[in-house]
Structures are given as C-alpha cells and as structure tokens.
Amino acid sequence: MIDAIQSVGAFSNLKEAEGTSLTASTALSLPSAGASAPQSQSFAEVLGTMTTDAIRSMKSAEGVSLQAIRGEANTREVVDAVMNAEQSLQTALAIRDKVVTAYLEIARMQI
C-alpha cells in the first residue's frame, strides 16, 4: 500500500534523476568538532529525507499491524507504531500546507 504512495511522490523523480533511489537512506550529518565549516543540505534533500522517514514509519506501522493480526505483536506495540506513523503523517501534511500557502502567496504577488 505504501509503495503505491512512494511512486507518486514528487521526490521520486528528482532522486531517480540524480541516480539515487527514494528508499536510500540519507541521514542528516552533524559537523564534527574539528570541522571548520558546517556542511549544509539543500531544501530538496531535507524534504526528501523527511519523506523517506515518513514512508519508513508508515511501512513499520503496517508491518506491526500485520504481526498483530497473526498474533505475533501485542496491542501496545501496534499503538506505538500507529501513533508514530500518524505523527509523521501529520507533520508531512503541515509542511505540505505551508508550502502550498507560500506558493499561493508568491503567485498572487504583482510583478
């Protein structure tokens, strides 16, 4: 179910064009104590990482739910996984709403 959502994502085309997959893990790196300049990421990379984490969270919740149906997971594990996935989804929706609002404001500007 989540794989279908992943193929529709806006970042799947971007990552495939760059030669990497959306499912590839891209973690945020913290600069080391001896580093002279902090390493920055582009906005697309940050959103891609957040999207990957949200998809991974939803897949995990789906897997735990299936384990519970088979009797291999208890209720607490299912609730924790589903709540984590719900929080990730709510964050993604909030970011989407902010991006759409910003786009609409830019579109209304007179040039």
From Swiss-Prot:
The keyword Magnesium belongs to this UniProt entry's keyword annotation: no
Record-stated family: Belongs to the FliE family.
Pfam families from the UniProt entry: FliE
Matching InterPro entries: FliE
Any GO CC annotation of this UniProt entry: bacterial-type flagellum basal body
Record's subcellular location: Bacterial flagellum basal body
Domain of life of the organism encoding this protein: Bacteria
Keyword terms: Bacterial flagellum
Gene Ontology BP annotations: bacterial-type flagellum-dependent cell motility
Primary location: other
Designated gene of the protein: fliE
Keyword Cell wall biogenesis/degradation: no
Membrane-spanning intervals of the chain: none
One Gene Ontology MF term: structural molecule activity
Protein name per Swiss-Prot or TrEMBL: Flagellar hook-basal body complex protein FliE
